[in-house]
């Protein structure tokens, strides 16, 4: 079965602000893809996935990845994250100049 795009957009980062890219409530396995071509030396980007263990639980971090400076790979993928209740993808730039990051969430 081929993957489909569950959500997409572009986020211009405000330094130190954690931006919510999308919240998914349909059970499945999802992966975040982000174009990091805009990163420059001195920039630091954090991508996070947060999920609930059960319906009424608090959403908590299940994955994070940090990218610093110019990247050799201009598009980066998260690990696949299976969910039943809720999945929240966030982007936070913690250093450098705020950049615009095109992104897509793929349903696998």
Residue ranges and their predicted role:
Residues 62-79:
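An anionic, turn-rich surface loop/hairpin at beta-sheet edges
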Residues 27-34, 79-101:
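Noncatalytic modules at the cell exterior or secretory-pathway interfaces
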Residues 53-63:
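Acidic Ser/Thr/Pro-rich low-complexity disordered segments
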Residues 104-108:
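Low-complexity intrinsically disordered segments
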Residues 42-55:
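Short, surface-exposed beta-strand/strand-loop-strand elements in extracellular ectodomains
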Residues 1-26, 38-43, 58, 71-75, ...:
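Surface-exposed ligand/attachment interfaces on beta-rich extracellular proteins
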Residues 38, 68-71, 83-88:
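Low-complexity, flexible helical/coil segments
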Residues 35-37, 52:
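Acidic/polar N-terminal loop/beta-strand segments that form early-domain functional surfaces
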């Amino acid at each position: 079965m081929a993957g489909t795009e569950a959500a997409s957009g572009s986020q211009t980062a405000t330094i130190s602000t954690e931006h919510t890219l999308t919240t998914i409530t349909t059970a499945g396995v999802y992966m975040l893809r982000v174009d990091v071509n805009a990163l420059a030396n001195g920039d630091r980007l954090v991508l996070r996935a947060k999920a609930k263990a059960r319906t009424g639980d608090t959403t908590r971090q299940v994955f994070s990845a940090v990218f610093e400076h110019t990247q050799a790979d201009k598009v980066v993928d998260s690990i696949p994250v299976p969910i039943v209740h809720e999945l929240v993808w966030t982007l936070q730039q913690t250093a450098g100049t705020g950049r615009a990051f095109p992104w897509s969430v793929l349903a696998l």
